[in-house]
């Protein structure tokens, strides 16, 4: 949404008010009609508050179409307009503790509450406290207990008829429970989407290669306002009732809390996170309690709502033009804010992932000052069209890493610069590469890069790699932080005195680790390849590489075409292997590991062409305990005969070899009609005889 009008200074109140009205109306249209909000809530509130203050200071600036004189947005095309029997008003906002104290004082004074000599209220106001949901407000109309119509808030006076869409929301009863129901009931509440449902919806959107929703609020609004109710029916929407418009045929409950209990008796969904409290202290206590559990709630909220509980006191307090005097929304610190992006750097993760990071002018958001925010990856920067120098929307929720949501294109300076992914790692100078079909670019210096050092050492020491017993994460942390080990090759230079000085590392532990390192010097080529931590190269692929090439040097020098000849190595894996060995830093570390007195293994000639016997190319599954063969021995014999040993039974399985205590794999094989062999049958196959 373009905002091209120049921003006038505060010294020109007429022009400033006109500019503020324009900004707010454009934001309202994007939010309520397009369902594509482009202005953070905090920025909207700031502009709205400034306009309110201007109009208070200069009453002649108030216009009938000012956003301060209305509630919501225009009615969009495509839906039938609905005039509300009672206006759907919004709420005034409070942010600081002082705002809440001032609200309580205004209410207490208006109700004539008694005070002591110190000015403290001796008869505090009773309030009902609820959550402020981040969804879409709607009105539900029931006639004689039967649901007949649903409408959106719209501009507060006229909304949109979304009856057929709301019928698809399963938590909304189409008929109220109980024998005694009002002749007419206008229920006010919020349509929202739970966090888990939002995550599942976006998973489906990704699978269908459709646009993902930015947040649960956008998803709920977009789903409710679909022209096709069948689409709405596929969206996991929920509803909570929290207010009332009109009531006919039954007396109104005496308190707001009683109204919500009454709703529950009718089968309407009402949120249980609510309380009745007294005075400003009670309000602030509820706010803090909710704030502590906010992130663990299954839905998004952006604050809490306070309402004078007694209905007769609500009536005495009445309304102002756009909001009730008896209620206030106490909003949490903004989770989104505007600031300027001054630079884009890249960070290197422990697995080599290169992440663009926005360097920001400091901004207070989500309860903390933020100067850095993630941009996720190069594609995200391009998709969001974020450039250096832009005014950007920054989001921070709870403990989540701050992120840049988008840029305000109308505020883009002429010299805004596009982000260019560097070609070399900023930490170690190795090449940065990006595999086909992957969103993440990576540093290829896995064995050398300091940013990947701990991960490389941990992987190298794994049981299925060099099997260095006693080299756990805490020991690795100390070795790296004390600069005693930079690459896996340095492990074999460690001495007893150095290890014995490590924190909480006794002499016996030091000797055990040295013994384990000595043992690790004698390994296999497959274990060594796996221990290098090449992306996409697991234990099975490492074995295939070792078997195919016979020695390490041919693997290091192999072309992508030669790598593709290896069993189960596809284009992505071949590219990853080739990139790893093409990086000179990695080759240097490997040569250090192969130096005299370091790591050795038995090498042999390249594997002959694949066997042509009855097992060549067959898939075999082992299950249970064989009388004379261990599972590893059986696996080696099968692989030597050209078979592939799989871990699970499927329609592609050719044989299942079952021993004692065979379980679900045997049952699955029998169900699929796959031949089942015992140990004798296995030997017959290995000898070339079909069973």
From Swiss-Prot:
Give every BRCT domain span.
610-691
Q: What GO cellular component entries does it have?
A: cytosol
| Active-site residues, record numbering mapped to chain | 132 (n6-amp-lysine intermediate)
Q: Which reaction does it catalyse?
A: NAD(+) + (deoxyribonucleotide)n-3'-hydroxyl + 5'-phospho-(deoxyribonucleotide)m = (deoxyribonucleotide)n+m + AMP + beta-nicotinamide D-nucleotide
Record EC number:
6.5.1.2
Q: Which UniProt keywords apply?
A: DNA damage, DNA repair, DNA replication, Ligase, Magnesium, Manganese, Metal-binding, NAD, Zinc
- Required cofactor(s): Mg(2+); Mn(2+)
Q: Which domain of life is it from?
A: Bacteria
Q: Which HAMAP family match?
A: DNA_ligase_A
This one is known as DNA ligase
Q: Which organism is it from?
A: Burkholderia ambifaria (strain ATCC BAA-244 / DSM 16087 / CCUG 44356 / LMG 19182 / AMMD) (Burkholderia cepacia (strain AMMD))
């Amino acid at each position: 949404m373009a905002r091209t009008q120049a921003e006038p200074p505060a010294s020109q109140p007429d022009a400033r008010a006109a500019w503020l009205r324009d900004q707010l109306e454009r934001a309202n249209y994007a939010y309520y009609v397009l369902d594509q909000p482009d202005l953070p809530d905090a920025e909207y509130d700031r502009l709205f508050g400034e306009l309110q203050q201007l109009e208070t200071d200069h009453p002649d600036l108030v216009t009938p179409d000012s956003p301060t004189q209305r509630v919501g947005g225009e009615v969009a095309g495509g839906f039938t307009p609905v005039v509300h029997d009672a206006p759907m008003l919004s709420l005034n906002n409070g942010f600081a503790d002082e705002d809440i104290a001032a609200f309580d004082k205004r209410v207490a004074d208006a109700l004539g509450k008694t005070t002591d000599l110190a000015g403290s209220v001796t008869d505090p106001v009773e309030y009902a406290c609820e959550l402020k949901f981040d969804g879409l407000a709607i009105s539900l109309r029931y006639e004689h207990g039967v649901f007949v119509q649903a409408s959106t808030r719209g501009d507060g006076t006229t909304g949109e008829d979304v009856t057929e869409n709301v019928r698809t929301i399963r938590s909304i009863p189409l008929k109220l429970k109980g024998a005694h129901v009002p002749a007419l009931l206008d229920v006010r509440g919020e349509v929202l989407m739970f966090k888990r449902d939002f995550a599942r919806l976006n998973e489906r959107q990704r699978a269908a290669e459709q646009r993902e929703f930015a947040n649960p609020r956008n998803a709920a609004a977009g789903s409710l306002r679909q022209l096709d109710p069948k689409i709405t029916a596929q969206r996991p929407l929920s509803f909570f009732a929290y207010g009332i418009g009109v009531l006919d045929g039954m007396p109104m409950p005496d308190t707001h809390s009683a109204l919500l209990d009454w709703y529950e008796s009718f089968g309407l969904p009402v949120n249980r996170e609510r309380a009745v409290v007294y005075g400003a202290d009670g309000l602030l206590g509820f706010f803090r309690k909710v704030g502590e559990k906010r992130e663990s709630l299954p839905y998004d909220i952006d604050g809490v709502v306070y309402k004078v509980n007694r209905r007769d006191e609500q009536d005495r307090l009445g309304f102002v033009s756009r909001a009730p005097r008896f209620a206030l929304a106490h909003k949490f610190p903004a989770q989104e804010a505007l600031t300027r992006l001054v630079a884009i750097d890249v960070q290197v993760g422990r697995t080599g992932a290169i992440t663009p990071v926005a360097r920001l002018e400091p901004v207070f958001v989500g309860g903390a000052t933020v100067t850095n925010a993630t941009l996720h990856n190069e594609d995200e920067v391009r998709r969001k069209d974020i450039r250096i120098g832009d005014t950007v929307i920054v989001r921070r929720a709870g403990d989540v890493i701050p992120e840049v949501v988008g840029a305000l294109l109308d505020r883009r300076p002429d010299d805004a610069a596009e982000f260019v992914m560097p070609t070399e790692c900023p930490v170690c100078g190795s090449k940065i590469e990006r595999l086909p079909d992957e969103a993440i670019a990576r540093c290829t210096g896995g064995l050398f890069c300091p940013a990947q050092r701990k991960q490389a050492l941990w992987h190298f020491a794994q049981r299925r790699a060099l099997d260095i017993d006693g080299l756990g994460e805490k020991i690795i942390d100390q070795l790296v932080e004390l600069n005693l080990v930079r690459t896996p090759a340095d492990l074999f230079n460690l001495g007893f005195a150095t290890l014995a000085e490590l924190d909480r590392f006794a002499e016996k532990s030091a000797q055990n680790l040295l013994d384990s390192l000595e043992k690790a010097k004698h390994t296999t080529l497959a274990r060594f390849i796996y221990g290098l931590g090449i992306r996409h190269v697991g234990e099975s692929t490492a074995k295939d590489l070792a078997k195919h090439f016979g020695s390490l040097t041919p693997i290091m020098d192999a072309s992508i075409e030669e790598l593709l000849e290896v069993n189960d190595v596809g284009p992505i894996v071949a590219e990853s292997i080739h990139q790893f060995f093409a990086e000179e830093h990695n080759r240097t570390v490997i040569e250090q590991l192969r130096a005299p007195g370091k790591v050795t293994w038995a090498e042999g000639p390249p594997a002959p062409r694949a066997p042509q016997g009855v097992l060549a190319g067959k898939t075999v599954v082992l299950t249970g305990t064989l009388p004379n063969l261990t599972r590893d021995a059986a696996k080696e014999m099968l692989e030597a005969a050209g078979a592939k040993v799989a871990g699970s039974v499927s329609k592609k399985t050719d044989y299942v070899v079952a021993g004692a205590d065979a379980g679900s794999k045997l049952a699955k094989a029998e169900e699929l009609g796959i031949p089942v062999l015992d140990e004798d049958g296995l030997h017959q196959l290995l000898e070339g005889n079909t069973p």
